């Protein structure tokens, strides 16, 4: 029973047998806490339960919670691999009581589990309590039989937990085990407490107070329990090993790494193997929960984790990307407990492969930049810390690699400046990171929602109804009436108008009343979750509170919206079939005339894949199967295979939309081919969609793709317009529609050939008879002191060709300097300066090109001592630029 998986199941089953609900781990991206970057404790998903904001159908719970501590306040990243217990990803086992049992029962359960079920030696255990918590002290004596010296009173915040400056709080009791005197360290509270001999593995938090203000603390009417046990630490104890990396799970991951590399860990390399094993876990779980590598926020932290592991893989001698080849081993170890790993396996592999491929390229580029930036430094100098950070931040070039590369030359790195730059970047990441909290609604809607309650939505059954005006709002204030020509918003007691949500736009239409009252609805919005607000203008009459109205949704528009919304479901499932189970929705927009669908995928979709997606979706349209909706419990829906939008918060009951007959008959899913949790409006049969045409595919963020599509008459019009364009192109090319692609290819090849010939002719002309330098020499070559200078201004030569001209010029003169200004058609200029190898000690091409650039109205320029380039906005100053180079050479 000492394996990680067995320990996890033993813990959960123990508390289930003692009346606790086993609650699945929440995602690593917190749904209900915008203050956190990542979930870092088991209580995070219950925060609103503890504060009384949210009610659950149970009062006792137990979980095994995925946690990440990397970035922000809790950051273990730099320690991982070099200590026995630090991890970026770990599992927190916990049991929770929401106003049910309290301190005595919590201690009883904990003691029974660790001594009976886990079989720990009582004589090796000791606990801490908050120094004023006499109750906990007495309970440990009573239940465990501890003597006073094994119940240590701690006066610091280590033994008092608080949710924040205000809110629930209370004392803690931590359970420790003495692992023996072969490990350095002392008991908690002693000078040697930072050692690893006495290992804390379970923290019991007794939430019995509420911090009202900084000075005022009161008793909670219903105290609660929150506990957290580190699974990896418990495995360490149960398996009798000194480090979490020696437990079965990590041994298997390290063995897989060794097998992939062809050699195992030794004293010099063991830290790298450990880093890879830990970072593989955090990277994989973050990707499976929807985080993808980027340069800001959560994605920035993930990229740091990934690239740190990839750097260690390279240190171990990996010649090719390694991380993606280890995912199978992680899925084998943890996929049973966390099915999301299995579902996202392909996405995780591809994300790691692409990131490591990019990283290897940036390493090569980074080394080249490092060489250039440090070229003028000598032994004992310090490399600029800001430049070191730019290498890290822009090129993914780690600081330790910069230090290693410069160490052999006796050059250090200004780490203080690097750290300052890092802190600025972290602040930027925090500012750019938008948490997961809901945006605050306008203040006016709070009292209205309190007074009116939720709006009854009738739109699933009808698009026409009667309603009564419950509230009117004008210019952000409640109003008694709206007159003809006035714009405002109104709330009805019931409505068939769909309010914008779930990506579907709000309905439009008209509201008609006696006496010629007509209100044109231009949008319908949802405030505070369930208050439907109709926005528009009074076209005639006067609208008053209590007015009875006939409510008419724009039926044609709603019909098109329904078709586009149902099409998004079919496209979603078709994408999964073509690209893999990792496909997960990240957003959508459903309008009457188009749709877009954003989803997780690490690379562009090929034309062939798009065609297959379109064909599969249209096959289901042609089935003309009935679209069914049913309301069921959220857990029942998920067990039935219903897809949910990542990060969306669902109630206890959800609406499930199913469509597609054929796959159901094959037994793929009992509910249908496409089954999603959805509150939107849909067609009655798939055939009502008419036709689905994919019109675009693009990237919207790192690892997130977007598909755009049309349905019905909009798709037909798009097809007709496309055919008309094809016919026009065929007529212009004097060929058939079928032969248009081949004809265009032939014309493009012919154009490329002519462009090459023209470029060659221009270069020959430039070197043989172009406008010469200011001295007027026909060849453009003159002596500056004892050095030849070929200085020419040419027109119609692209920047990329100027370098080859400079190379040709260097060959012609044998020894000297070549300066060529190319003037473009819009009057701008580019300049290239080349210096033959024998003269680079006297003349630096970078310095010369910068002088010329300044004369052209530009600044800067870069390259190598033997070849550099720059540009400027004023091509008319080409003679002055060449003269400036000559002057600079003369003064050298």
Swiss-Prot record:
Binding-site residues for Zn(2+), renumbered to this chain: 565, 569, 678, 682
Keywords: Aminoacyl-tRNA synthetase, ATP-binding, Cytoplasm, Ligase, Metal-binding, Nucleotide-binding, Protein biosynthesis, RNA-binding, tRNA-binding, Zinc
Cellular component per GO, a single term: cytosol
Main subcellular localisation: cytoplasm
Gene3D superfamilies xref list: 2.40.30.130, 3.10.310.40, 3.30.54.20, 6.10.250.550, Bira Bifunctional Protein, Domain 2 (3.30.930.10), Threonyl-trna Synthetase, Chain A, domain 2 (3.30.980.10)
Reactions mediated catalytically: tRNA(Ala) + L-alanine + ATP = L-alanyl-tRNA(Ala) + AMP + diphosphate
Cofactors required: Zn(2+)
Domain of life: Bacteria
Cofactor note text: Binds 1 zinc ion per subunit.
Family membership noted in the UniProt record: Belongs to the class-II aminoacyl-tRNA synthetase family.
HAMAP family: Ala_tRNA_synth_B
Function, in words: Catalyzes the attachment of alanine to tRNA(Ala) in a two-step reaction: alanine is first activated by ATP to form Ala-AMP and then transferred to the acceptor end of tRNA(Ala). Also edits incorrectly charged Ser-tRNA(Ala) and Gly-tRNA(Ala) via its editing domain.
Name of this protein: Alanine--tRNA ligase
């Amino acid at each position: 029973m000492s394996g990680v998986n067995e320990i996890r199941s033993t813990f959960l089953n123990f508390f289930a047998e003692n009346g606790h609900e086993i609650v699945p781990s929440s995602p690593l991206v917190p749904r209900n806490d915008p203050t956190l970057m990542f979930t870092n404790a088991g209580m995070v998903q219950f925060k609103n339960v503890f504060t009384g904001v949210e009610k659950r159908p149970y009062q006792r719970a137990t979980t095994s919670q995925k946690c990440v501590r990397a970035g922000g306040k809790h950051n273990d990243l730099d320690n991982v691999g070099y200590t026995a217990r630090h991890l970026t990803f770990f599992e927190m086992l916990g049991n929770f009581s929401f106003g049910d049992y309290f301190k005595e029962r919590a201690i009883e359960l904990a003691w029974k589990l660790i001594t009976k079920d886990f079989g720990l030696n009582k004589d090796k255990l000791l606990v801490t309590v908050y120094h004023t918590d006499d109750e906990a002290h007495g309970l440990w004596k009573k239940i465990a039989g501890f003597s006073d010296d094994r119940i240590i009173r701690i006066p610091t915040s280590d033994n008092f937990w608080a949710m924040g400056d205000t809110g629930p709080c209370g004392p803690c009791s931590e359970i420790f085990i003495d692992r023996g005197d072969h490990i350095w360290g002392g008991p908690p509270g002693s000078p040697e407490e930072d050692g690893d001999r006495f290992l804390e593995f379970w923290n019991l938090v007794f939430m019995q107070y509420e911090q009202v203000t900084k000075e005022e603390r009161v008793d909670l009417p219903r105290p609660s329990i929150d506990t957290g046990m580190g699974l990896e630490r418990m495995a360490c104890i149960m398996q009798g090993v000194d480090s979490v990396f020696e437990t079965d799970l990590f041994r298997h991951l390290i063995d897989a790494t060794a097998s992939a590399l062809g050699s195992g860990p030794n004293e010099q390399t063991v830290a790298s193997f450990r880093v890879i094993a830990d970072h593989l876990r955090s990277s994989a779980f973050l990707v499976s929960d929807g985080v993808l590598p980027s340069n800001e926020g959560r994605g920035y932290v993930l990229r740091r984790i990934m690239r740190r592991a990839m750097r260690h893989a390279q240190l171990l001698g990996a010649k090719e990307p390694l991380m993606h080849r280890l995912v199978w081993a992680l899925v084998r170890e943890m996929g049973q407990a966390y099915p999301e790993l299995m579902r996202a396996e392909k996405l995780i592999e591809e994300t790691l492969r692409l990131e490591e491929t990019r990283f290897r390229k940036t390493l090569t580029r980074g080394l080249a930049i490092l060489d250039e930036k440090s070229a003028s430094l000598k032994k004992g100098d310090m490399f600029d810390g800001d430049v070191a950070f730019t290498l890290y931040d822009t090129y993914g070039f780690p600081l330790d690699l910069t230090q290693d590369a410069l160490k052999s030359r006796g050059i250090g790195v200004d780490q203080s400046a690097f750290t300052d730059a890092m802190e600025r970047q972290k602040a930027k990441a925090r500012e750019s990171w938008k948490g997961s909290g809901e945006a605050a609604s306008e203040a006016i809607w709070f009292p209205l929602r309190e007074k009116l309650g939720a709006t009854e939505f009738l739109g699933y059954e009808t698009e026409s109804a009667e309603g009564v005006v419950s509230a009117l709002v004008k210019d952000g204030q409640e109003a008694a009436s709206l007159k003809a020509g006035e714009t405002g918003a109104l709330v009805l007691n019931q409505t068939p108008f769909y309010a914008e949500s779930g990506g579907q736009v709000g309905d439009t239409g008209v509201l008609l009343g006696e006496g010629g009252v007509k209100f044109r609805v231009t949008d319908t919005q949802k405030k505070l979750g369930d208050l439907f607000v109709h926005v528009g203008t009074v076209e005639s009459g006067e609208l008053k509170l209590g007015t009875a109205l006939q409510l008419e949704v724009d039926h044609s528009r709603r019909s098109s919206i329904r078709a586009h919304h149902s099409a998004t479901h079919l496209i979603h499932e078709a994408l999964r079939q073509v690209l893999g189970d990792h496909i997960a929705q990240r957003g959508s927009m459903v309008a009457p005339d188009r749709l877009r669908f954003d989803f997780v995928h690490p690379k562009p979709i090929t034309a062939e894949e798009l065609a297959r997606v379109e064909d599969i979706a249209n096959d289901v349209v042609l089935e003309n199967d009935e679209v069914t909706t049913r309301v069921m419990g959220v857990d029942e829906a998920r067990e039935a295979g219903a897809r949910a939008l990542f990060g969306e918060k669902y109630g206890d009951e959800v609406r499930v939309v199913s469509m597609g007959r054929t796959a159901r008959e094959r037994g793929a899913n009992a509910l249908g081919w496409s089954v999603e949790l959805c509150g939107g409006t849909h067609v009655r049969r798939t055939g009502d969609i008419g036709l689905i045409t994919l019109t675009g595919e693009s990237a919207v963020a790192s690892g997130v793709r977007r598909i755009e599509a049309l349905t019905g008459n909009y798709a037909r019009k798009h097809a007709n317009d496309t055919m008309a364009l094809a016919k026009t192109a065929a007529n212009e090319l004097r060929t058939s529609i079928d032969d248009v692609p081949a004809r265009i290819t032939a014309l493009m090849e012919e154009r490329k050939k002519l462009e090459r010939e023209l470029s060659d002719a221009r270069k020959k002309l430039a070197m043989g008879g172009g406008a010469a330098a200011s001295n007027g020499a026909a060849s453009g070559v003159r002596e500056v002191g004892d050095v030849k200078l070929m200085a020419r201004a040419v027109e119609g030569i692209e920047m990329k060709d100027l370098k080859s001209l400079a190379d040709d010029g260097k060959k012609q003169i044998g020894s000297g300097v070549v300066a060529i200004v190319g003037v473009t058609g819009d009057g701008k200029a580019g300049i290239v300066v080349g210096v033959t190898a024998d003269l680079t000690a006297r003349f630096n091409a970078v310095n010369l090109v910068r002088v010329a650039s300044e004369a052209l109205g530009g600044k800067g320029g870069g390259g190598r001592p033997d070849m550099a380039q720059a540009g400027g906005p004023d091509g008319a100053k080409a003679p002055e630029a060449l003269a400036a180079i000559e002057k600079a050479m003369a003064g050298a």
